[in-house]
Amino acid sequence: MREYKLVVLGSGGVGKSALTVQFVQGIFVEKYDPTIEDSYRKQVEVDGQQCMLEILDTAGTEQFTAMRDLYMKNGQGFALVYSITAQSTFNDLQDLREQILRVKDTDDVPMILVGNKCDLEDERVVGKEQGQNLARQWNSCAFLESSAKSKINVNEIFYDLVRQINRKTPVTGKPRKKSTCQLL
């Protein structure tokens, strides 16, 4: 079974943990409890293929920056999350993306831009078109709006990253084990 290392990044309070826990455990976490770093594993089926996802839920961008290079280096796919209710969280993502590309030393990194908390439409300050435009600027990066609370597009975030990783590095046929027979 193929393993995928996915990393969820963004400013504090955008709902990174809420999205991750909703995806992995099917629970909405109401209380805000700042994360240092949590790792989750979940087996899923994407396009008929069994996958083991290892999801790293990270601290907000303003905290624990020293750890960031390491998980950017090891991550295969990245969800860059902002809150549609806070413009500053959207603005923070450009630097984060540039850091990922610098650490990975390539422009071709599986990535999805996520506008979270879309259930709070009456508190929206970041328009959907702003997210779409930024995703286009980022080499046609995938874009979704989501809500961990209302379970909108939660699974799609992680499945999309798996599909991007599969397109970038497809699994070839399983290498056959070479067996040798020795007669003594």
UniProtKB/Swiss-Prot annotation:
Propeptide section residues: 182-184
GO BP: cartilage morphogenesis; cellular response to cAMP; chondrocyte intercalation involved in growth plate cartilage morphogenesis; convergent extension; heart development; hematopoietic stem cell differentiation; negative regulation of synaptic vesicle exocytosis; Rap protein signal transduction
Lipidation (S-geranylgeranyl cysteine): C181
GO MF assignments: G protein activity; GDP binding; GTP binding; GTPase activity; MAP kinase kinase activity
Localization of this protein: Cell membrane; Cytoplasm, Cytosol; Cell junction
Record InterPro entries: P-loop_NTPase (IPR027417), Rap1 (IPR038851), Small_GTP-bd (IPR005225), Small_GTPase (IPR001806), Small_GTPase_Ras-type (IPR020849)
Subcellular location, principal: membrane
Keywords of the record: Cell junction, Cell membrane, Cytoplasm, GTP-binding, Hydrolase, Lipoprotein, Membrane, Methylation, Nucleotide-binding, Prenylation
Protein name: Ras-related protein Rap-1b
Organism: Danio rerio
Gene: rap1b
